[in-house]
């Protein structure tokens, strides 16, 4: 996939994190080159392992102008399956959650509170509902803000994570375990003893170069 090599930084913006994690620097740069696209086998594992290892990876979105934006993942939550009372699939399949019961490596997108789209990737064995919710990428914190920034809606639900779908994940540099924080998931107080499980994984995004990287298209 030949692309032209460009390298410019054109703007800087600082925003305050709602959780006080960091004041993030948002820059834009143009570059060439592709990293390794994560295959379904990467996701065909326990959701907590996948969530942890997604930190530092790149979420890529194909824009209408054929440019591709790369955003570094810094926060994700794991939902482990039918025994996890915070998991959408613990009561069985429905029209809304049926994507969770499919094969690993597919997007699961649903509407929360009637207004915010949530972006998840299906993990684990087909037939057992498990997924990882993406909560923070680049300079954007919060799953609703994330999908709004990316332009993600229901059209991605059930699509495989691959360039042809317009939304995929590429391998990053990895994050040392000592830099990863674990906390209970957000907004799952209804899930009894599962509400306190430390299945939210995050790193301070200041450890990354938080630029939004733009590549020319295919």
Predicted regions located by residue number:
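Conserved, well-structured core segments that form or line functional sites
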Residues: 2-218
């Amino acid at each position: 996939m030949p692309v032209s090599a460009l390298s410019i930084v054109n703007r800087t913006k600082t925003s305050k994190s709602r959780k006080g994690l960091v004041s993030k620097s948002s820059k834009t740069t143009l570059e060439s080159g592709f990293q390794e696209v994560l295959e379904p086998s990467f996701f065909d594992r326990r959701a907590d392992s996948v969530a942890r290892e997604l930190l530092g990876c790149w979420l890529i979105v194909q824009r209408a102008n054929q440019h591709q934006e790369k955003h570094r993942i810094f926060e994700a939550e794991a939902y482990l399956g039918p025994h996890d009372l915070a998991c959408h699939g613990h009561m069985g399949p429905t029209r809304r959650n049926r994507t969770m019961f499919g094969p690993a490596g597919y997007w699961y997108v649903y509407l929360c509170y009637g207004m915010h789209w949530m972006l998840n990737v299906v993990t684990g064995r087909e037939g057992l509902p498990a997924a990882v919710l993406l909560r923070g990428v680049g300079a954007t914190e919060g799953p609703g803000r994330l999908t709004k920034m990316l332009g993600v809606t229901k059209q991605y639900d059930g699509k495989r994570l691959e360039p042809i779908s317009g939304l995929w994940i590429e391998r990053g540099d990895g994050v040392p375990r000592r830099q990863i924080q674990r906390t209970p998931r957000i907004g799952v107080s209804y899930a009894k003893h599962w509400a306190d499980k430390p299945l939210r994984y995050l790193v301070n995004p200041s450890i990354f170069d938080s630029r939004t990287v733009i590549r020319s298209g295919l």
